[in-house]
Amino acid sequence: MDASCNAKPAVVAVVGPTATGKTALGVALAQQFSGEVISADSMQIYKGLDVGTAKVTPQETCGIPHHGVDILTPEKTFSVADFTALAGEYIQDITARGHLPLLVGGTGLYVQSLLYGVRFTAEKAPDGLREQLTAELEAIGPEAMYAKLQAVDPEAAAAIHPNNKVRVLRALEHYHATGKRLSEQKADSLPPERPYRSLVLGLDFPERAALYRRIDLRVDKMLEAGLLAEAEYVWRNRETFRTAAQAIGYKEFFPYFEQTAALDACTEKLKQASRNYAKRQLTWFRHMDGVTWLDAGAADVQQTALRLTQEFLSKG
């Protein structure tokens, strides 16, 4: 890759719902095309949260550099604007060294904001707004707060789980601070052209049952790998690990630690929450322009992805 010209940097993205094999495909592409992986996962940035976030292991990296993993302690916050700025630096550095940036992950807002060049305003929320909304949430509960978001920004609400209090609060905070819905912000903040030349490969299974079986199996393997201890670590620090405490994979076990639910019930709740999350991920990526979808269960999925990537790079 020639970094000396003024052409847009080339970026290949591997996206899709959880448990579709994105990590393995990203590594395979990196091995073939001298690539480096940039994580597009909103939870894998946190140190010490390995099992519940399905963080890539040293063995799984196969020596391929992975950026955007293990960079913050769990009490820190990390916004989509932070991600686009950091990932942009990674892309510039990787491209300058003659390597291919590979964006791999399932956080659709991260992928779309980076590749489509969404600009984020520097407007700061009025002092006390977050505290006011938080107090309101505690007073009326998450369901009523989610209903408020549905009333002012149904499009944003559709992409957020009703129990994800952090994202519900952020969306409401944005609306009250700017007078605009997040969907309007997206439209207003799109620049005339995209900052990168990109190929977006989406992984999914033709049969939804196949994906759900993989999700259930992944949860079982996570428990064997120490998920419960990690979830207890988050539970004990839930007042400071606010983002992690809302994450799928941890919060489902809080009733078990509080001795109000059995472990089996919490495990089933996690499996259901993971399946629901996968559906929301698919909804997001299906609405994204320019995604080339691949059958994650096909025997030749890697070969197909390699061929498409080769064709994409040859056009540069």
Each PLM stretch: what is its role?
Residues 1-316:
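Phosphate/pyrophosphate-binding catalytic cores of soluble transferases and nucleic-acid-acting enzymes
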